Structure formats: C-alpha cells, structure tokens
C-alpha cells in the first residue's frame, strides 16, 4: 500500500480538524486518541475505532503491529512520516492516532459514588482526578457547563486511558444534576473547620470539585456537606487534583481498611 502524501486527503483532514477544533469534535461526535498507550488502553476495553492513521515507519514498529492486528485493515490509513508530522499534536512518541466516537450515555438517577467537576479547566488536574477516581472505583463522572471538554485530545492524554473505563456525562446543568444525583454531595471548602478525617465516608458520595481559582460554585456549596483538608503549614490551598485524590483515598481507606 502506497502511503498517503497529501494533507487534503479527507481522512487526514478530518483527523487534523478533530485534533485542533472543538467545534468539529462537537459537531461530529468524534475525537482523536494519540499514541500507543492510549490506543492500547482503548482496545483493551473492547471498544472499536473508526479510523487509525499511522506513519509509514510506525506501521512496522513492534508496539504498533500487534495493535494494527486487532483492527480491520479497511480502517487503517498509512501516511508518510512527513505528513504525519504536519498533523500530529504530540511532539514525540510513536506516530499513531485513532479517530473514535465519543461515547453517549443517558444520565439516569445516580445512587452510587460519583465525581462532579464544576468548572475545572486545567487538563492536568482533570486527568489526575479521572485517573484517581477510576483507581478507587468511582465509575461515574459529571461535568457542569464551562468545564473543559473531557474528550479533548489534551484531556485524553492527561487521563492516560481513564476516560475509557468511566461513564462521563458532560455539560449537565446544575438543576439537572440536583434532580438526578441522589447521593449526598460533599465539597472541599476552606470555609469549614471540620476536616475530612472527622467525616464518615462509608456510604456513597458525590464528590464536587470546583474551578482551580474560584472553587466550588455557590449552587453546590448550598447543597453540599463542606469538608476541609488539614494544612498545618498554612498553605492557602491545595492543587485541586491533589485535594480530590486525598478525598478519594480517605474514602477508600475508611471502607476497606478501617
């Protein structure tokens, strides 16, 4: 098979638009995962790709060949190394990407543990929270309007595959969240003296974590139990990714380790 050389190729053009344009991802309901690790994590969940784009050199890479073997050959597009470098967003790594359909889930009544991201923007923090939530067994994630898109290529890379194991509901208005989430809300706050270690976290919890600068919105604070994380050295606040991870693991400790 001769590799594609033109950036005007429809498959290449579409993938590049998905990588760079939120409106294209929103309109098509698709996104792009880049690199061997993410593609492997995606396939390991039993999920199906729409298209794979791989550079000519990478198509013979020992980590890539087993992955390509799991994919219908009609879905594989080989392009020249120089063309791949024009469209990729990763600066290094093995040159392979896949176009995938963004999963669509219906938000029903939530009675178990869940994570609510309220206006978070930093992809690093979001990735940390998704990975940690998945690690402790939280499987449902809800975002409010104005939260970063969890299926953007940057968030996908930061999540390192956690997205594929989670049920994600994005851009859900506050009133719908209050109507659907029956689990008690807990929110980190600097305006309470009751630290997390004095709370009973044995029962299902809906963790609310807010914007990096503004914190959790007043709509949630009015409905949630506020908890504090002890900071004896007087730091003003913790990184939200770190704060959320501490909460999740204290919950896990109480439930499984007494």
Language-model regions, residue ranges each:
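Short, aromatic/basic amphipathic alpha-helical patches
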Residues: 62-72, 219-220
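RNA substrate-binding interface of SAM-dependent RNA methyltransferases
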Residues: 44, 99-192
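Boundary-proximal intrinsically disordered activation/regulatory segments immediately upstream
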Residues: 1-62, 147-148
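Amphipathic alpha-helical repeat scaffolds
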Residues: 35, 122-128, 237-242
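Short acidic-hydrophobic, aromatic-tinged amphipathic segments that line or gate anion-handling sites
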Residues: 3-6, 77-80, 166-174
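Glycine/small-residue-rich loop that forms an oxyanion/phosphate-binding "nest" at active or ligand-binding sites
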Residues: 68-97
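Active-site/ligand-binding-proximal alpha/beta "capping" segment
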Residues: 186-235, 240
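Structured adenosyl-cofactor binding patch, chiefly the S-adenosyl-L-methionine
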Residues: 134-136, 147-164, 218-258
């Amino acid at each position: 098979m001769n590799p594609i050389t033109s950036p005007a190729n429809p498959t290449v053009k579409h993938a590049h638009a998905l990588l760079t344009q939120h409106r294209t991802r929103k309109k098509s309901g698709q996104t792009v995962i880049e690199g061997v690790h993410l593609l492997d994590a995606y396939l390991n969940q039993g999920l199906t790709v729409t298209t794979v784009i791989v550079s000519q050199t990478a198509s013979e890479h020992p980590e890539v060949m087993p992955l390509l073997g799991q994919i219908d050959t009609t879905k594989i597009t080989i392009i020249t190394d120089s063309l791949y470098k024009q469209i990729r967003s990763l600066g290094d790594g093995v040159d392979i990407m896949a176009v995938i359909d963004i999963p669509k889930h219906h938000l029903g009544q939530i009675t178990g543990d869940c994570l609510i991201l309220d206006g978070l923007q930093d992809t690093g923090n979001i990735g940390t929270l998704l990975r940690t939530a998945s690690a402790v067994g939280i499987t449902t994630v809800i975002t409010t309007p104005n939260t970063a898109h969890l299926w953007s290529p940057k968030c996908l890379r930061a999540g390192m595959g956690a997205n594929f194991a989670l049920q994600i509901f994005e851009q859900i208005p506050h009133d719908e969240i209050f109507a659907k989430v029956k689990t008690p809300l807990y929110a980190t706050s600097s305006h309470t003296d009751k630290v997390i270690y004095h709370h009973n976290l044995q029962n299902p919890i809906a963790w609310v974590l807010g914007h990096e600068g503004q914190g959790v919105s007043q709509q949630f604070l009015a409905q949630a139990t506020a908890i504090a994380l002890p900071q004896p050295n007087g730091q003003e606040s913790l990184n939200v990714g770190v704060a959320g991870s501490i909460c999740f693991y204290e919950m896990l400790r109480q439930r499984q380790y007494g």
